[in-house]
Amino acid sequence: MTQTSVLTQPRTTPLEPTELPESFRAILPATNHAALPPMADHWKQLDLLEILSRPAAFISIGQSNSVYRPGGVQYGEGHAFRGNLEATVRSATAARAAGNFDFTWVGYSLFRSQYPQTDFDRVQYASWTDEIGATQEQIDWDNTLVEELQAIREPGDKELFETALQSWFVGTDLPGTLARKRIEVLVFTGVHVDWCIEGNVRAARDNGLLPIVIGDACGAQRPEQEAATFDRINRFFAPVISSDLFVDLVRR
């Protein structure tokens, strides 16, 4: 292939695949452990070891090329350097070995021109991506589950995309799947913790389920947004634990 053909080859990424500046990477925390709150007193009354031994679902949300690869629409948030992908891989591997977890890889696309839309949705979705002018190939690449998680995906795992604003409880068959499999324990990882994770955790509680959030396997758009979100989730909706604690519990 000549140099000219390389230069004119269509780009597969929605944005230019440019690495983040070293100056920005240098200020990103390698992990968000410091943002994780102490477990709320009421959750301390639970036997999490027993709860995590029940039929359970491991649910990763939004962990795509968009977030972790140069050229992705959300790559500029720096998640590739903030440790949540590594914590997800470690947690998912332990859950797989435990043998009692179903796996669901939930996609969250920012490109929503074909989604059913209210007037609110229309203007909000347009603000995310309309100026990018991405091709379908670029959109498909952006939405693809990141390679590190594809490597631990297995036949029988469920993959789906959210079609509501920020919840898979509306517009997908996952709630029905969980009900039919008698699964009530849900373990969440992914982005964004103050958006899809918190929204689905709240919905899970309202639907009689038992959500648990692996905090360092999640991330907000900006690191400084995480502590308040984790504190709110932990106080009101679900235990927020570290990947180290999760791995320890499911390996016992």
What are these regions (language model features)?
Residues 221-235:
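Active-site-proximal loop->helix
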Residues 101, 184, 210:
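Short acidic/polar active-site loop segments enriched in Thr and Asp
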Residues 194-195, 218-222, 247-248:
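Short gly/pro/ser/thr-enriched loop/turn and capping motifs at secondary-structure boundaries
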Residues 137-185:
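Internal catalytic-core helix/loop-beta-alpha segment
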Residues 197-207:
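Short Gly/Thr/Asp-enriched flexible loops that form oxyanion-binding sites at enzyme active sites
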Residues 239-252:
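A charged, well-structured terminal subsegment
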Residues 2-155:
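Active-site acidic carboxylates
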Residues 187-190, 208-223:
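A short glycine-rich beta-strand->turn/loop micro-motif centered on a GG-aromatic cluster
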